[in-house]
């Protein structure tokens, strides 16, 4: 899979949902649902409410994303 056309934005975790999903408020004040990427799962990185994260979005569905990096 190529990363062409992917949109990367920063956001803040608002709530944790079940199944490794989170509600994230992006820097442009849009709230999306984001899943945790595979590498974050493998290395067991904890993501909590209030953390700043980097989210990757597909241009086809801007309401769902993938958390690819935890900033703090």
UniProtKB/Swiss-Prot annotation:
The keyword rRNA-binding applies. Disulfide bonds: none annotated. The keyword Protein biosynthesis applies. One of its GO terms (molecular function) is translation initiation factor activity. Keywords: Cytoplasm, Initiation factor, Protein biosynthesis, RNA-binding, rRNA-binding. It is found in: Cytoplasm. It holds the Pfam family eIF-1a. InterPro entries: NA-bd_OB-fold, RNA-binding_domain_S1_IF1, TIF_IF1. It comes from the Bacteria. Residues 1-72 form the S1-like domain. Its main location: cytoplasm. GO terms for cellular component: cytosol. Gene3D superfamilies: Nucleic acid-binding proteins. Belongs to the IF-1 family. Component of the 30S ribosomal translation pre-initiation complex which assembles on the 30S ribosome in the order IF-2 and IF-3, IF-1 and N-formylmethionyl-tRNA(fMet); mRNA recruitment can occur at any time during PIC assembly. One of the essential components for the initiation of protein synthesis. Stabilizes the binding of IF-2 and IF-3 on the 30S subunit to which N-formylmethionyl-tRNA(fMet) subsequently binds. Helps modulate mRNA selection, yielding the 30S pre-initiation complex (PIC). Upon addition of the 50S ribosomal subunit IF-1, IF-2 and IF-3 are released leaving the mature 70S translation initiation complex. This is Translation initiation factor IF-1. It comes from Malacoplasma penetrans (strain HF-2). The lineage of its organism: Bacteria, Bacillati, Mycoplasmatota, Mycoplasmoidales, Mycoplasmoidaceae.
């Amino acid at each position: 899979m190529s990363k062409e056309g992917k949109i990367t934005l920063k956001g803040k975790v608002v709530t944790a949902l079940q199944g490794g999903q989170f509600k994230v408020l992006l820097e442009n004040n849009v709230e999306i649902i984001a899943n945790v990427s595979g590498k974050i799962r493998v290395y067991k990185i904890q993501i909590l409410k209030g953390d700043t994260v980097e989210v990757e979005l597909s241009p086809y569905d801007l309401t769902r994303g993938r958390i690819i990096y935890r900033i703090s």
